[in-house]
Amino acid sequence: MIRQYLILFMFFLLLGGCAHQIDTKTTLYDDWKPRLAAQKTWQVEGKLAFISPEERQSANLNWQQTTNSNNLILTTFIGTRILSLKQTVNGAELEFDGDEYFDTNAAELLKRLTGFTLPVDNADNWLKGTIDDQSLVVDELGRAKQVLWFDNTGKKWQIDYGTYVQNAGYWLPTKLTLKHQQIKIKIQLYDWQFK
């Protein structure tokens, strides 16, 4: 008799546990896009692939932004640092091959020393998918799908947003592709954090 009650108790306990599963997704803000655009302190990790007719390169990335600085660190897949690029109001600093270099523009400094073209100066808008432009195409949920955009140096970029994840009340891009002439940059993002 006690055994039957114990089995019945365990059955109801199991049933109750299934009925109260916790949803791991956060609630989406109704005004998620303007809130995300206003969010100026963030960090994201991911992978980056640079593809041109001459070469193909890939790296892990750690991108951090605060109200005063933008810091991009690229590492190999085993964790060896390739470069560190920091932009502040005072200028840009690039650590590459054990040396430090300085300039006023982070994207130009990166291009000059590595040959790598990436519009790092406006990353806050295009990386989060909050870019606002007349050419912007959005999906049925209001998320950026594609945009033609000019960076600070006048280069025209086509940015295609592949997939999103719902996190911290926002829709955040997880896969995007940037194209400029014959250059293609594929970025996969994960582990978005906001402070």
Predicted regions and their residues:
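Gly/Pro-enriched, hydrophobic low-complexity segments
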Residues: G129-K195
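Flexible, processing/modification-adjacent segments and terminal tails
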Residues: F96-K155
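An acidic-aromatic
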Residues: S69-T117
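Bacterial Sec signal peptide processing site at the extreme N-terminus
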Residues: F12-R35
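Post-signal-peptide N-terminal segment of Sec-exported extracytoplasmic proteins
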Residues: A37-N71, T75-T76
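Beta-strand-dominated lipid-handling architectures at cellular/organellar boundaries
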Residues: E45, Q64, S84-K86, G91-E93, ...
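Positively charged n-region of N-terminal signal peptides that target proteins for export
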Residues: M1-Q4
